[in-house]
């Protein structure tokens, strides 16, 4: 038991001793740490003081440096300002001197002006005096004298001017005619169409003459109903087994012709049946119109047209101009324009498109007011055609200036198609009037003895006085006559003016 107590006391004493020793060690360490901290603080304070001193020194140096730089810049600015002030003073002095010089010049100019005015008045007075003396001596006014001088100069130099004009024209025509002939010949020889002339009547063959009476009907009711529905004249005469449909509108005439053929084939002819067959014939013709328009685009290779434009193209199949079928004419113009464009190296597709559509307005010109070119341009504008194509339509009859080479080509192709022999027919009365007018224009010129229109009005031969007109002036006269014909006369194609100067000398041997 005692052993346990002593052991416990030993442990307790050991613990107390350990505690005391540990406490002393800790206190000793704390004292050392405190001293170290004091040393660190002192070192830090010393270092901070040194840094502060260094910073102050550096700041002072920087401030001094900035002050020196500012002072230097200030001096430079002052020097620059002083220099500018000196320049300004010098410039003001120069301006002042210039003002003085200008004042002197103005005074001098004013004196000169006054002197010139006085001289002008003196000259006018002298001119008036001389004019009065001239009028007294010559007996004519200055205006008359001026006219005499101008007339003398005109007569003197007219020959020289005409000679130079003739030389220039000859050189130009020699080259341009060769090239133009080559282009047109190459185009024409690659396209040679055939045409059959259109007329204003259509004939329908009947199986027998009894059918004529059935077409007339009781008291003429059938023929009256037919003419009312179709808008044509049905001519029934003594010609055996044949009747004639007459109408200026080929479309109505074609529908009427098909209506009669259907009535004859059906055998039942009365007003109601006439109306039924008319509607069927009308539907057939509408189909033909669409097919004709599509065929025209296929033949020419023109694509991308609006369906309504294709339909209007088809209507041209039943439209004529001077006896020429307008659809065939449009196809021909498109193909010729394409060939010429190919020869000249311009846009073939545009030329073909413009050529095919150039007369599209004729499909509606019976129904809408205005020229066919204006109507056609409005149609193409409505269905989205380009401005260039519209210009081709307007320019082919001169209602607009052509803006592209293709527009000029289309106009030329149109003229070629129209001028081709046999392509068109004219009314006899209009034809005769045009020939008379052509000869009158040629005879209106001075020194013309006579004039004759030949070659169906496509050439006029002018006989001149040989002692008044020489070869050079004859060339000028032909040009002047051609210009006047262009201004006063409308005609298809190209018209040739030939001036003939013939000198005959006669002597008799006895």
Curated annotation (Swiss-Prot):
This is Ribonuclease Y. The gene is rny. SMART domains: HDc, KH. It comes from Thermosipho melanesiensis (strain DSM 12029 / CIP 104789 / BI429). The keyword S-adenosyl-L-methionine does not apply. Keywords: Cell membrane, Endonuclease, Hydrolase, Membrane, Nuclease, RNA-binding, Transmembrane, Transmembrane helix. It is found in: Cell membrane. InterPro entries: HD/PDEase_dom (IPR003607), HD_domain (IPR006674), HDIG_dom (IPR006675), KH_dom (IPR004087), KH_dom_type_1 (IPR004088), KH_dom_type_1_sf (IPR036612), Ribonuclease_Y (IPR017705), RNase_Y_N (IPR022711). It is a single-pass membrane protein.
